[in-house]
Amino acid sequence: MFWKFDLHSSSHIDTLLERDEVTLKELMDEEDILQECKAQNRKLVEFLLKSECLEDLVTFITEEPPQDMDEKIRYKYPNLSCELLTSDVSQINDRLGEDETLLKRLYAFLLNDPPLNPLLASFFSKVLSILISRKPEQIVAFLKKKDDFVNLIIKHIGTSAIMDLLLRLLTCIEPPQLRQDVLNWLNEEKIIQRLVDIVHPSQDEDRHSNASQSLCEIIRLSRDQMLQVQNSSEPDPLLATLENKEILEQLLSNIFLKEKNESAIVSAIQILLTLLETRRPAFEGHIDLCPPGVNHSVFSVNKNVLAAIQERLPSFHQLLLDPPKTGVMKTTWGILDPPVGNTRLNVIRLIASLLQTNTHTINEELIELNTMGVILDMFFKYSWNNFLHTQVEICIALILASPGDSPEHSTISEENSAGDHVLLKHLFLKCHLIDRILEAWAMNEKRQSEGGQRYGYMGHLTRIVNCIVHSIEKGPNSVLAHQLVKDLPTDAQERWETFCTSSLSETNKRNTVDLVTTRHIHSSSDDEIEFKDPGFSQDSAIQQFGFNDEKFADQDDIGNVSFDRVSDINFSLNANESANIALFEACCKERIQQFDDGGSDEEDIWEEKNISYSQETQRRSSSGSTDSEESTDSEEEETIKQGFESSTVNHEDKMEVDANEASNWTANFDIPMETAHVANLDSDGSDVWSTEEPLSSKETDWASFSQLTSPINTKESVRSSSPVEMETSTEPVDPLSVNASAQTEVTVAMDAVSDGEEEGENADQMTETVMNGSMKETLSLTVDAKTETAVFKSEEGKLTTSHDSACKYGVVENSDTAMENPPSQPSSSSQEQRISEQIALDGASANGPV
């Protein structure tokens, strides 16, 4: 995302490069110079390829910076120069490899006196190494011209960066022929002999360590190369030189002078251990011996190496008895005087490697020297040195696992001579391995019983005992080992058997850790017995969720008692259900007929016809007009639909209205009634109730709703359009009151004649009926279209009453019913107007949300 949107800041290097007098240091002061160089900025690369710039870069990494500079920025430019030269830009590599002047300036760094600056040496080694890998022919040709190159490498071998450069020269050259030429050239320069001469007590420790590591890496690299190139016609010259008997004798003679130097001895033993390596173990703890019949040099040890070591075995044995002088070591366990030391530890490692070769002559020499006895003494003496214990355990395991040796084989023999395993006999009979193990175990138990600390070698001792038991039972020398145990004195034999069956068995049992539990994995359905029954009754519907309803339709007997009582509740209503059902079906049929226009031949549902509005429709029309002067088309359509539904209802079907709602109902007739098809005034102010014929434009545009501006009141809820009778509570109501305080029910029945001729005769009159549960009072409502005023006139008549205690709603079906009342004249009485306004306001407030 960072690069996608180009949010990185632009580099200042391009701006600097546009200047003619820009210098290299100014560019190196920029923070992003390395990124620009690795991105191969064309201008920057061209600038760096200048001769003076490359010379400055090489100078920075080969010359010491001034001493008076701040330490924080002293090596800033050498570091940047090294990074720029090793950024792996092909143009820079080509220029450095082809320009001999730059190579000479770079090579001049080796001419400095030792010790070299370690940091500058690392810069020099890094630059020359990348040139060797990228331009091998040019660099090798240049180095061969220098007669003192190998001498300078040996001179500065104490610097680790120079040692790395030598190894790079051996490993970074990919062409096989060129690599072979380099090996031959270095062998001719006697680099192996010079490195061996460095492993001398007269040299310092750094030179010992680096020379030894260089020789070890040369051995490993040469053997790896032999594995990769099986058909190589020429052997590795450096490895062959190092395995020469004269070179090995020279190496051993250097370390066994009168003056014993621990660093030189350890370095020489490291080289011998590398020569004794056959093939690296496939995994830790695995001894990879040479397979039978395989004579590859990687799987065998050179005889010259074994012969040279065998001659110096007494000297190595003496090192175990008299190591180089070391100081007293204080540890948390106590004072070690003398400590084991690195020399004796490496000598035991060398003996373990010799035992792995299973050479008869070497085994005879070790028996004569009693080297294993000395090693066992050290094992029990230094009870807290785990490095020593590990090597002793390896030595004993190798002796027990190796087959019987044969005098005519100097390397690993595949013969198993049970009666000729001299080293195994020596271990049991001369070294008294069994007796020493039993004695040490008893001492440890006694010490622990007294509250003392357990010996540190007890873990390794347990493994040694298990190895002996395994060798007696299933080992390659089981016959000989079993016979050697039987040849023990009777007392020792009994103690051994008791120890194996009691102490050893208990220790192994205690040390054994079960990685996997014995309990088998089973289905979770078997665990149902582990779950207790809940203390509460569970819903049977949840228990039967997801099952087949036909199969599991029966409810459980443990259902909740409170839910069982639901069936006892009586939901019957005291209502005229037959009339309600008939009214509901009639309404549904009417709605289906109105909107079923798919090929029907019935009359158009939009055709004007005699309609009458229910109380709810009139209320919504009145209340909507009082709140605002605007109306939406959707509300107009809803009003028309309500009219269609009301026109189909029989005048004997009555709706029961709550008296509480009727008590708060009032009507307001001062606002013009803008309901469609009823008393709608034309937008130009003409009298729609007059007998004059309307204009043609109004006839064609009678259904245009764009000019209606009164929206419905937003405070109203969704109204119910169902014509079914509703049973409500019946409270005592004053039958003569027409305002809100009297709690009356008002039903407004309006009849609008849609025909043009009938409008002129009957348009000025509306009838509103005020009634309650016991009687009705009919008010004749007269509307003057010119003055837009409405006046009520009371007219008593005998009205039918409902048999129920609730109020009934009378619907005037057609215009004839409305014409039974004589028309009333408009009145200008202020008192009647106030009554009308109060009725309208109360009606709107009472019937707001339905």
UniProtKB/Swiss-Prot annotation:
Pfam families: SAPS. InterPro entries: ARM-type_fold, SAPS. Residues 826-839 have a biased composition (Low complexity). It comes from the Eukaryota. One of its GO terms (molecular function) is protein phosphatase binding. One of its GO terms (cellular component) is cytosol. GO terms for biological process: regulation of signal transduction. Residues 703-731, 764-778 have a biased composition (Polar residues). Residues 627-638 have a biased composition (Acidic residues). Residues 610-652, 683-778, 793-850 are annotated as: Disordered. Belongs to the SAPS family. Regulatory subunit of protein phosphatase 6 (PP6). May function as a scaffolding PP6 subunit. This is Serine/threonine-protein phosphatase 6 regulatory subunit 3-B. It comes from Xenopus laevis (African clawed frog).
